[in-house]
Amino acid sequence: NTRPESVNAKILKQFIEIGLDRLSVGLEHGNFNFRKNVLKRNPSNETLLEHLEIIANSGVSFSINNIIGFPTETREMIFETIEFNRLIRGFDALTISIFTPYQGTELRELAIKENYYDSESLTTHTTSSSLLKMPHLTSEQIDGIFRTFLMYVRFEKELLPEIERAESFTSEGNRIWKQLFDLYQERYY
């Protein structure tokens, strides 16, 4: 596991020489201001893309790791992460996680301060559903984007309205999601 900005051609070449064949790269978020001010990661999107291009050109297989559902995050910010992923070339896998408010982290404290999370709750493992109660982005909305994130990144823009309908956990949303999931499996596995 690494951050994109920590990779340069010289270091990557040295790791390849000793047997590196795969990298897992933590992008986490595509909105520069959110990444800088909330996640405390300063590299610009342009810098990250430059470093990801070095990895893509090396021939090393790599995956991109993303997180959604952060405290104060909006739907628009999540879609900036999706759009940023659409710019990255050469990856062979994407992972998407939902933010987990781990004890002792600044982000957990932010969630508590904003009344998105109960200070008495303890989380000891990653979650498959958002634990935050944000008025501007519900757990169900986060879960819907979570289940369609890979489709938003990989599919052509003409399918975006259908993907948005697949976010919904209704019978229609589930039916559309299943059709799109089957198409995703056919194309990418």
Residue ranges, per PLM feature:
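A structural motif corresponding to the C-terminal lobe/cap of the Radical SAM core domain
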Residues: 1-171
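C-terminal non-catalytic accessory extensions
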Residues: 170-189
